[in-house]
Amino acid sequence: MAAKLKKGDKVIVLAGKDKGKTGSISSVDPKSGKAIVDGINIAIRATRQSQTEQGGRIPKAMPIDLSNLAYVDANGKATRVGFKMEGDKKVRFAKTTGDVIDA
């Protein structure tokens, strides 16, 4: 199935401890159906010091399920994403406004 949410999309969290927060997707794992969103679902990870990195308690963005994310449209509201054909090209569009997301 085609990816409705992609890297770089601005999304809002629908459920969980960060409900209502917005952020940009930094990576998507389609196999597990999860995405990493900047500044969302932060966990503290203890890491050992190495020659290149400082050790200690480092905040890290953890994956969040794609079903708990919604695309943010031009109005700043959460919307579902659909697909339609424009000419011979398949494009994503916001279902609330009908605007094409990626032309």
Swiss-Prot record:
Disulfide bonds: none annotated. One of its GO terms (cellular component) is ribosome. One of its GO terms (biological process) is translation. SMART domains: KOW. Keywords: Ribonucleoprotein, Ribosomal protein, RNA-binding, rRNA-binding. It comes from the Bacteria. One of its GO terms (molecular function) is rRNA binding. Belongs to the universal ribosomal protein uL24 family. PANTHER family: MITOCHONDRIAL RIBOSOMAL PROTEIN L24. One of two assembly initiator proteins, it binds directly to the 5'-end of the 23S rRNA, where it nucleates assembly of the 50S subunit. One of the proteins that surrounds the polypeptide exit tunnel on the outside of the subunit. NCBIfam families: rplX_bact. Part of the 50S ribosomal subunit. This is Large ribosomal subunit protein uL24. The gene is rplX.
